[in-house]
Amino acid sequence: MSFLGYGTPGDGVAATEFTQCPIVEEGTVVFNFNDPTSVDFRAEGMKDPWESFDKAGDADSFEFGIPSPTPEEMKEFMGGEVKDGKWNAPVDIPIIRKSMKITTLPYKDKQTEYIFALCKISAKISRAPSSEQTDLMLVRCTKLTPVSAAGKQGSPFS
């Protein structure tokens, strides 16, 4: 991965500028893209369904880990505030929405860029520091469909 960053979504569209996360722990980027759920209509005496369609399954998401996060990174992804250089957790669960961008490393003249126009962000400290590793902030980005103020739905993913 050559880039993982976040930005402020526009009105029903993805951000146009992204801030790069300086350090993402190796091996922590995981896509959780779910299969649709099949709904079958069956009739007595018929072996196969007479009709079948797919509906959306669980929401798609991806995760990544930031080792030894700074107070500013904790504020971006966990909410709260930074005061006198220290992060203070929010009193209530925050509502955090961001556009996210991931760019793969180039390979044989190919490179893929993933842009998630609108994501629900949730994060937590998932690993405590020890003598052999740092603490780790695990960030989960759940893909949402952006909707403009005029009610027009935009593409959630490109």
Name each region found by the language model:
Residues 1-71, 118-134:
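Solvent-exposed edge beta-strands and adjacent loop segments
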Residues 10, 23, 91, 107, ...:
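Generic low-complexity segments that are intrinsically disordered, proline-rich and/or Lys/Arg-biased
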Residues 13, 36, 85-86, 111:
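Intrinsic-disorder/low-complexity loop/linker signature
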Residues 42-54, 78-91:
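Short secondary-structure capping micro-motifs at structural edges
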Residues 61-65, 99-101, 138-141:
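Beta-strand secondary-structure signal
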Residues 72-76, 150-151:
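Short, conserved charged micro-motifs
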Residues 81-110:
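Short, acidic/charged, Gly/Pro-enriched secondary-structure junctions
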Residues 110-158:
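Mixed-charge, glycine-accented linear interaction segment located at domain edges/termini
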